[in-house]
């Protein structure tokens, strides 16, 4: 079996609809196309290295401070950037979950340790906390909702994971790339924990929802 690390490779295949990366099958929104065409006169200049206008726009949409926003070329680049910045020697990753976490960890010479989701309970996170308590790690990835199972992490378990990691100086990387599809996004996003947990990093993506 061929190992799949990321979808979207349609160029050597005949593909009508690509569901491998869960992007919008309707194509680029008209507003995005208009913005590109209407700003072509500035393409010869370097962009603002601090992405000031973009960060302020994202901050307004997400209702967080602009200084907390870091923009990148997709979630995978940001996952790599977090690992590069923290330089952990061991990271916890759920199994099963998105393979990009392990790829980023190994790219910087760190080790991946898996906390296993309960298959008998629909791959829930019920046992995650007890497993994390016994791990010697510097970073923990959580995916909410999890990819590929689609499960949301229950509120009590999510807070428990954040508490465990804060008490042990473990950076929590919360991948919320698919969370906006939930109508309760603003209520259940980890954004509400940013003031209480300075070890929390949230990853989000433009392509999935827009």
Where are these regions (language model features)?
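Active-site pre-lysine segment of PLP-dependent enzymes
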Residues: 123-136, 148-168, 172, 176-209
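Short glycine-rich anion-binding loops that position phosphate/pyrophosphate groups of nucleotides
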Residues: 22-24, 75, 98, 144-148, ...
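Short, structured coil segments at secondary-structure junctions
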Residues: 65, 108-109, 196-197
């Amino acid at each position: 079996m061929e190992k799949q690390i990321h979808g979207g490779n349609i160029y050597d295949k005949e593909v009508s609809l690509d569901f491998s990366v869960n992007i919008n099958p309707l194509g680029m929104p008209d507003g995005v196309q208009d913005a590109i065409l209407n700003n072509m006169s500035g393409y010869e200049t370097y962009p603002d290295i601090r992405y000031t206008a973009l960060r302020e726009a994202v901050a307004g949409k997400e209702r967080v401070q602009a200084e907390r926003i870091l923009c990148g070329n997709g979630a995978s680049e940001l996952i790599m950037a977090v690992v590069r910045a923290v330089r952990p020697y061991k990271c916890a990753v759920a199994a099963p979950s998105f393979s990009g976490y392990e790829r980023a960890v190994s790219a910087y010479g760190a080790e991946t340790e898996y906390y296993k989701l309960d298959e008998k309970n629909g791959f829930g996170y019920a046992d995650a906390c007890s497993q994390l308590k016994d791990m010697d790690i510097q970073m923990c990835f959580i995916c909410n909702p999890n990819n590929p199972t689609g499960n949301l992490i229950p509120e009590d378990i999510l807070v428990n994971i954040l508490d465990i990691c804060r008490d042990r100086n473990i950076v929590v990387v919360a991948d919320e790339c698919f969370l906006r599809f939930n109508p309760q996004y603003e209520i259940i996003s980890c954004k509400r924990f940013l003031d209480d947990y300075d070890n929390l990093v949230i990853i989000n993506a433009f392509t999935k929802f827009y």
